[in-house]
Amino acid sequence: MFQCFLYIRDPNNASEVDGNHYAMPLTISPVVSAETMKVTRIDILPTGVDNTIKEPSPYKVQPPNEYIPEAQNIRMDVKPLNVVQPEGASFQVTNFSEQGRAIAWQKWEFKVGFNQREGMVLYDVHYDGRPLFYRLSLSDMNIPYADPRHPYHKKAAFDLGDAGAGIMANNLQLGCDCLGSIYYLSAVLNDDKGEPLHMPNCVCIHEQDAGIGWKHTNYRTGRAAVVRNRELVLQSIITVSNYEYILAFQFNQAGEVMYEVRATGILSTQPIDEGISVPWGTVVHPGVLASHHQHIFSLRVDPMIDGPINRVVYDEAHPMPRSDFNPHGVGYTVNETPVTISGGYDQNWDANRIFKIQNASVKNPVNGKSVAYKIIAPPFQKMLADKDSFHFKRAEFADHNIYVTSYKDGELYAGGKYTNQSRGGTGVRSWADRKDNVLDDDIVVWVQFGINHVPRIEDFPVMPCEILKVALKPVNFFEKNPALDVPPSVQSFNKSVLASMNHGQEVSEAVVGEKAAVCCVKEQSKL
């Protein structure tokens, strides 16, 4: 059965097919049989402060609330900002199969695939020839809504399991979705009849400047050493009905991998009586309610940190007790605890708990520590739905920051293989409950992150990007900062220019020593 929510176009501008119909929700909700494709009943939606159902009344036309550019008074003071690489991009793309592509960039090497459910998947990630990750992908996503009334209590979308990050991917356009020197990847999936479905430009690859990578100024001599932090970005954008997700893997020159999610698009809306408010949502337009909801993501990390046998440990910082050795009470230590059995594990922000994926058999030649990559994920509020609710039972990944499981073929999706009308019991929580050994074994790490989206009126008619990022960073993996060999940031390379007093762009390049002098590394060193 399908519970359908209906909207209308602006009756005063019905020919505008791109009008924002989410600003005009209706109070009727047909229920359609998936077997017969016929309407079995029509529910009347509650629109007040409780679950009382009112008799339908003529629709009251509200003013439109549009997001399309032609409906706005566009700013006229935005000047061009061009991303130019006169010698082209620094990455190379080669074919290793009919569909797969291999990427090489700044000591990084990996393969890229694309499938119907996960969308973009990375394989065999190496840095300077050393293995790091066998497979990286966004495994699952759940969006449970907060309205407890029928029929809204059913709203809990699995945007990957129910729809698919691959099949919902946008055709990315040059100059719109990615800026600079762009390389596009296309894919071939299949439609619901098993026929080939061409997905053009579903991934864009480009470089971006991410600010300063590292810097130090010798205050004794005034000499500054500084490098820029350049990133390689692989980006895909999916549209799942009203919502957009901008999904990107990012690599930098310091051996770090990031996974970034930008949530944007339009809120899922429902009708509400004028002049009232409810504690489970925000009124964003006259007669329009946007319910509170969570976005909970699960990133699947299949590691091979210097080899296939890995473990997960976590560090915690604790104060040292006062003693003759610590008479002033300022000392603290960091303790490491291994994770030995599969299960769900959580952050402890008070102890600065940091999870690391470690290879205990490979030691750093400088300090003797085990080589590792640490997981840095933003804090998020875990699933708020009751543990006996179907929301909680179905989203098996939504109750812990980290899950660690032993590797098993076919265990790819944290919410289970089939999420549509699922009952739970087939996802990562169930796999972790096997209590397998995960100490020095072939393991998989599942990293959860997300947001509790309490809508604000600024999120409508289209929401500014909400940005989330997970980082995988080396810990005692290298012998020193791996970005030391990045070319210094100098004016002769970067070609920056001075802006005039009225903020117009000068045609001449900036020169060190002029007004608003540029701070760069000396190009000649005495060392």
Language-model-derived ranges and their functions:
Residues 1-2:
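Noncatalytic N-terminal accessory/assembly modules of large enzymes
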Residues 7-254, 262, 266-275, 282-527:
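Extended effector regions of multi-domain proteins
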